[in-house]
Amino acid sequence: MSAVRRVMALASTTLPTKSGLSLWCPSSPSLARRFPARFSPIGSRIASRSLVTASFANENREFVIVGGGNAAGYAARTFVENGMADGRLCIVTKEAYAPYERPALTKAYLFPPEKKPARLPGFHTCVGGGGERQTPDWYKEKGIEVIYEDPVAGADFEKQTLTTDAGKQLKYGSLIIATGCTASRFPDKIGGHLPGVHYIREVADADSLIASLGKAKKIVIVGGGYIGMEVAAAAVAWNLDTTIVFPEDQLLQRLFTPSLAQKYEELYRQNGVKFVKGASINNLEAGSDGRVSAVKLADGSTIEADTVVIGIGAKPAIGPFETLAMNKSIGGIQVDGLFRTSTPGIFAIGDVAAFPLKIYDRMTRVEHVDHARRSAQHCVKSLLTAHTDTYDYLPYFYSRVFEYEGSPRKVWWQFFGDNVGETVEVGNFDPKIATFWIESGRLKGVLVESGSPEEFQLLPKLARSQPLVDKAKLASASSVEEALEIAQAALQS
């Protein structure tokens, strides 16, 4: 098996399609067996740690957030809402920007200039969650110190001290780790480092890709997940020869049923996108100018490309925090229902946190903006107040593609719940489509494309309540609207 095949296979097989929460990370055995007693959700939040007086004049900080993504921005807002930010909170980020809504980077940020692309400061947090736009000036006005372009390189938990790349030392009272993930990369020896090969996690990554798109003619996107789908849709707006390559048999295998995948694949083909499915990549080839020029497959065939985007998953950005308790089965830093690690005074939120998924009684790690926002808010409320309710997250996934001006069909789907059990599909892009997952007679998950605001609001109610539904009656529905009415009636019975 080639090195790339191993990387791509790992990215796909570590997220199984049959055992629940297949969108994000594998589920682990029940919490009762896996969750140690020391992670009790009720108890002292400060334990034996020492309190640190806030003073930006010296190196002490009462609260420090490491990371500058969605979770950091929403955590900062929650500190402000509780009157605990001014002169007390410090955010340390490796990026040059204040926290922003990261999903934009593979959506509107990639639109060509004539399609009105998104740009900062337009999508700073917390606009994606309906909140105020937190520009750099907002942090200054709220008395929040932000240290830009200086990532944390070391941590001494006994001394409650962080050291940055530049050598700056920060002493903290409470530490919130919100470092997110890093993109999985192709090894350098097979061309993963070549000019014209792109990975997207930050604004700088997206800017580099846009520079390539402006000159590109042929683009190959490696990975059939939602990142690959979003980048491919953006490439269509640039009028590029676009090919998606992935090892699975269908698009977005972790969520879509084969029938649903077939419908979306046809939609992409109508927009000129080509698919190479079940493919293993041997290496990326360089042209005479040193830039990527082709993607060579394991079967010996090649696909010409002057731009390649790798979207094969991500890994928790553990960095200097590897000595904290980790969850070895699903990755990430182990936390309890209040996002406390086993080390007093240290919390982890967002993509990097392995937490108890209360609704399904298992541990998980979720790489999604919705969880980043909600985990940040829950963690800070628990840290600052007497709030002791454990986090009760309902898995949620969405994507929006082809939303630029002139697109014949704008696509927006939402999913809530657990994609397990049998499925019922209703509709045929007329203009809607819905898929229901049913296990032991109960509705476990539901996906709707092009729903109304009222229909989208119904989905989490259905997924959380898991009502008993008549599968045959759902299957006989003549429209998505009728199917949702049947499900809603089951909810109310």
Curated annotation (Swiss-Prot):
<dbReference type="GO" id="GO:0010319">
    <property type="term" value="C:stromule"/>
</dbReference>
<keyword id="KW-0521">NADP</keyword>
<dbReference type="GO" id="GO:0009507">
    <property type="term" value="C:chloroplast"/>
</dbReference>
<dbReference type="GO" id="GO:0005634">
    <property type="term" value="C:nucleus"/>
</dbReference>
<feature type="binding site">
    <location>
        <begin position="367"/>
        <end position="368"/>
    </location>
    <ligand>
        <name>NAD(+)</name>
    </ligand>
</feature>
<keyword id="KW-0560">Oxidoreductase</keyword>
<feature type="binding site">
    <location>
        <begin position="201"/>
        <end position="202"/>
    </location>
    <ligand>
        <name>FAD</name>
    </ligand>
</feature>
<feature type="binding site">
    <location>
        <position position="107"/>
    </location>
    <ligand>
        <name>FAD</name>
    </ligand>
</feature>
<keyword id="KW-0274">FAD</keyword>
<keyword id="KW-0676">Redox-active center</keyword>
<dbReference type="InterPro" id="IPR023753">
    <property type="entry name" value="FAD/NAD-binding_dom"/>
</dbReference>
<feature type="binding site">
    <location>
        <position position="102"/>
    </location>
    <ligand>
        <name>FAD</name>
    </ligand>
</feature>
<dbReference type="GO" id="GO:0005739">
    <property type="term" value="C:mitochondrion"/>
</dbReference>
<protein>
    <recommendedName>
        <fullName>Monodehydroascorbate reductase, chloroplastic/mitochondrial</fullName>
        <ecNumber>1.6.5.4</ecNumber>
    </recommendedName>
</protein>
<feature type="binding site">
    <location>
        <position position="398"/>
    </location>
    <ligand>
        <name>NADP(+)</name>
    </ligand>
</feature>
<feature type="binding site">
    <location>
        <position position="95"/>
    </location>
    <ligand>
        <name>FAD</name>
    </ligand>
</feature>
<dbReference type="GO" id="GO:0005524">
    <property type="term" value="F:ATP binding"/>
</dbReference>
<feature type="binding site">
    <location>
        <position position="398"/>
    </location>
    <ligand>
        <name>FAD</name>
    </ligand>
</feature>
<dbReference type="Pfam" id="PF21791">
    <property type="entry name" value="MDHAR3-like_C"/>
</dbReference>
<dbReference type="GO" id="GO:0016656">
    <property type="term" value="F:monodehydroascorbate reductase (NADH) activity"/>
</dbReference>
<dbReference type="InterPro" id="IPR016156">
    <property type="entry name" value="FAD/NAD-linked_Rdtase_dimer_sf"/>
</dbReference>
<keyword id="KW-0809">Transit peptide</keyword>
<dbReference type="Pfam" id="PF07992">
    <property type="entry name" value="Pyr_redox_2"/>
</dbReference>
<dbReference type="InterPro" id="IPR036188">
    <property type="entry name" value="FAD/NAD-bd_sf"/>
</dbReference>
<feature type="binding site">
    <location>
        <position position="373"/>
    </location>
    <ligand>
        <name>L-ascorbate</name>
    </ligand>
</feature>
<keyword id="KW-0496">Mitochondrion</keyword>
<keyword id="KW-0934">Plastid</keyword>
<feature type="binding site">
    <location>
        <position position="254"/>
    </location>
    <ligand>
        <name>NADP(+)</name>
    </ligand>
</feature>
<comment type="function">
    <text>Catalyzes the conversion of monodehydroascorbate (MDA) to ascorbate, oxidizing NADH in the process. Mediates phytotoxicity of 2,4,6-trinitrotoluene (TNT), an explosive and environmental pollutant, by reducing TNT and forming a nitro radical that spontaneously reacts with atmospheric oxygen, generating reactive superoxide. Can also use 1-chloro-2,4-dinitrobenzene (CDNB) as substrate, but not 1-chloro-4-nitrobenzene (CNB).</text>
</comment>
<feature type="transit peptide" description="Chloroplast and mitochondrion">
    <location>
        <begin position="1"/>
        <end position="51"/>
    </location>
</feature>
<feature type="binding site">
    <location>
        <position position="400"/>
    </location>
    <ligand>
        <name>L-ascorbate</name>
    </ligand>
</feature>
<keyword id="KW-0150">Chloroplast</keyword>
<feature type="binding site">
    <location>
        <begin position="226"/>
        <end position="230"/>
    </location>
    <ligand>
        <name>NADP(+)</name>
    </ligand>
</feature>
<feature type="binding site">
    <location>
        <position position="248"/>
    </location>
    <ligand>
        <name>NAD(+)</name>
    </ligand>
</feature>
<feature type="binding site">
    <location>
        <begin position="68"/>
        <end position="71"/>
    </location>
    <ligand>
        <name>FAD</name>
    </ligand>
</feature>
<dbReference type="GO" id="GO:0009570">
    <property type="term" value="C:chloroplast stroma"/>
</dbReference>
<feature type="binding site">
    <location>
        <position position="254"/>
    </location>
    <ligand>
        <name>NAD(+)</name>
    </ligand>
</feature>
<feature type="binding site">
    <location>
        <position position="313"/>
    </location>
    <ligand>
        <name>NADP(+)</name>
    </ligand>
</feature>
<feature type="binding site">
    <location>
        <begin position="367"/>
        <end position="368"/>
    </location>
    <ligand>
        <name>NADP(+)</name>
    </ligand>
</feature>
<feature type="binding site">
    <location>
        <position position="398"/>
    </location>
    <ligand>
        <name>NAD(+)</name>
    </ligand>
</feature>
<dbReference type="InterPro" id="IPR050446">
    <property type="entry name" value="FAD-oxidoreductase/Apoptosis"/>
</dbReference>
<comment type="subunit">
    <text>Interacts in vitro with TRXy.</text>
</comment>
